[in-house]
Amino acid sequence: MRLPALAFALALLLPAAPALGGDELVGHAEARALLGKPNVRFVWADSEKEFTKAHLPGSVVAYAHDLHLLDDVKACQGLPMCEQRAAGLIGGELGIDAATEVVVYDLGAGANASGTWFFLKLFGVRSVRILDGGLATWKAHGGPLEAGQPAKVAAKAFTPAVDRTMIATVDQVKKATGDPAHYLILDARQTLDEYSGKALQTALASTDKEITVKRGGAIPGAVFSPWTRYAGNKDGQADKPTLRDPPELQKQLEKLKKNGYAPDKTVISYCHVGLGRGSFQYLALKRAGHQDVRVYVGSWDEWGNDPSLPLAALP
């Protein structure tokens, strides 16, 4: 469902979403106490192949990269999915409604968990937390496991309540490239090969069509800021925190001042599909206390596939 043009324009003028309150993570002990409760849903954010090997009992699957559909991004003003499709996924397939408490987890590194977390928060799921340390920490502490296919859950009614202060559209990013006094664009991709354009990635155009990005490179003015700088557990090891502590995250922001960071700027984070490394950087900056952070969900999948959009001049 498309927003009317006026409503969309007003959405861009809304105040930024507040900084996170510190409850975006849940420890393994608290998560274990939630197993089996009727209004709790555990959601796996990595690939289904990994899921079938071992997962928390009763889990469903919402692989972060599959939540970004380029055709929907273009059709629905920057959303990773159009609202009707997202409602069907969240309520119909995942069995989540307004009263559901959701715990998202991945193997342990946290990037994909952040993508699914971001997707659910964006569409209005109120109670969503990430399992700190992911499956690796859960296993290390003897948490129960099962293998095989996702749980079959009853469909629930879910009405999206989109928070557009969480995202930036391609038009807003284009504006940001020419307004460094008010915007900072951060490229959260992990390698310089992606940033420079040597590496080209694939993503979903629609639910049944995968494409390879046509052009490599970066958005003009974007600062290389890999998500691993903010990660406490980039290798997915047991008993390591998903995110660095707020003081450590704030030090990373201090380092970015030489690249134009300022607390009053709108920071736009992107990666290849937005839901993953870009959303992890969003989560980290919010945890560090930055107010106006947005994910460009279209990310390089949209920008790199549009020949009318400029590329950064890189050495």
Regions found by a protein language model. Name each.
Residues 5-16:
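Bacterial N-terminal signal peptides
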